[in-house]
Amino acid sequence: MTEQISYVNGIKLCSMFNSNLNSFCLSLYFRAGSIFENLSNNGISHLLEHILLRNLKNRFDNFYDLLAMHGIDLQGVTYKEFIRLTINGPYDKFDIATDILCCLFNEFCINVNEFNNEKKRIKAEIRENDERTSLDYYFNKLVWENTEAEKTVLGYCKVLDSISINKLNDFRKECLSKDNCIIYITGNVSPEDINRLKEKINMLDIQENQCKRINTVSVSNEFFHRKCVINVKNGYWNYIKIGFDINGSKYPNAVLDLLYSILFKGNKALIYNYLSEDNSIIYSYDSALEQYDNIGNMNFKFEVDKNRIDDAIMLVIKLLNDIKEGRFNFEANLKAEMYYTKMEIDRPDDLNWSLAYYNHILKTQQIDYTDDFYGRFNITKEQVIEAAKEIFQLKNMTIAIKGNKKKINIKNIEDVLKTLDIYY
């Protein structure tokens, strides 16, 4: 299986076919998001995602029924650095999906009431996520302060109120411009299907790109020079979030992915085994590897009993030091990652995201299904250990705790954290 790439009307068109499947995935990716925004329009990318989907509803009669009648699923998501709009469906409904996709490039045909209703839905999303008081919001500010990544994806209610339909339509043209869009097709699609899509794309009115957007963020003075301050936010339940700064240009991305997998993926994950399976301190956790072309942050969050905060942090430091010492099953984790990559061939949606992200959005090693190591996983245990030693240091660490400030022993936690650098 090989990736096919062509350019049509300024749009990069990528595909990887699998005729053995019963479905396809058709996605539009374009560079937008909070790292390309400023304080006066923060949240405009997320609003654009909503309005693009709302606009489709007005372009087709009984749009949601139309999707259901043809077994088509339509989704949108906004990240800090790009937007993805995805259509999944049965292989014989591809032409209908391409009609829908091409309508995303059309002018808005919504009225003021519909526009304001979508803003209200986003405001409800902001409230539902309790973003301003959340530990995630607090942590994000700590890690990305004074950089483009500090801004929230959802934006702010007052900023949303200031965005007009005309302003958003101008932003749409800027985003859906030549050399800023990728259309990716995976699953059971034929070359003839692709040719018909190319004809439709050629008919679209797409403006020239005025400013090339790159997937990098500024490096603040604090990045790689953390003071290991214990940041505490008042709250009833106790949550801990820990993250580490990463120099993205220093390591092969497969090393970072494997390190992330060792820590967080599946029942073999060290976080799961150390803190949940073996010691019953936590039930579950959330984790993320936030990456840009130059820097990134690997982080995780969990809830813990107020009487086990010190124990939890002690175990986290122990497992990080164990990785530095090579006390993990490299072979099992590497095999798992390679099998995950192989099995994505049978999941058009997951494959679509991975190929678009690793091969075209993030500047890193590309996935290559013609290679025994999929273009990425010809790495050694020593590389992973060396990366762990360099990344898991106090100078790269941000820690934030949400709980009762009066009952959290900062001194004890500081003493525990100091043992993180003992092996470096």
Locate the predicted segments by residue.
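His/Glu-rich zincin catalytic helix
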Residues: M1-F63, N169-Y274, I313, N396-Y424
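Charge-rich, well-structured scaffold segments of protease-associated domains
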Residues: F60-R213, I246-N247, E277-Y424
